[in-house]
């Protein structure tokens, strides 16, 4: 098999309140006979933003895009590309305790992130939320 491609990642602070992380991967994955490898997306992109609204409240927004990938080690069928939007908020209740809310798949996109075999594809989770409290001591 032969896998070629490249990956880029940028991570940084745009302002004293805005942190961003972005990445892109482009992949060409083939078996020695030239047929594509299964479950290797042609491209992937992600970006995550964290913005500090106040000294206690932070808002988060992220986007993940995954290109088409093959279900089998053959030219077809393919898992379709998808884009998922996630969001969240964190609030510092005390210096050591944070309340968090994360919402995954904000647009309730129907997507298929991977396949389990040559004839089954997994359905991505519909819109869902998680409330958490974390504490350090």
Feature map (PLM): residue ranges:
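Gram-negative outer-membrane beta-barrel transporters
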Residues: 1-73, 107, 134
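A subset of signal/propeptide-processing and intrinsically disordered low-complexity segments
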Residues: 2, 50, 62, 81, ...
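C-terminal beta-signal and adjacent terminal beta-strands/loops
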Residues: 68-72, 90-137
């Amino acid at each position: 098999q032969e896998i070629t491609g490249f990956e880029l990642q940028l991570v940084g602070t745009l302002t004293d309140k805005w942190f961003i992380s972005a990445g892109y991967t482009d992949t060409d994955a083939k078996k020695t006979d030239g047929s594509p490898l299964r479950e290797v997306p042609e491209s992937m992109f992600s970006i995550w933003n964290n913005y500090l609204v106040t000294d206690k409240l932070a808002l988060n927004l992220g986007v993940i895009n995954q290109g088409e990938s093959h279900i089998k080690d053959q030219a077809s069928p393919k898992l379709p590309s998808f884009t998922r939007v996630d969001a969240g908020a964190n609030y510092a209740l005390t210096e050591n305790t944070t309340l968090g809310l994360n919402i995954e798949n904000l647009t309730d996109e129907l997507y298929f992130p991977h396949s389990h075999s040559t004839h089954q594809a997994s359905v991505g989770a519909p819109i869902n939320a998680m409330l958490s409290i974390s504490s350090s001591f």
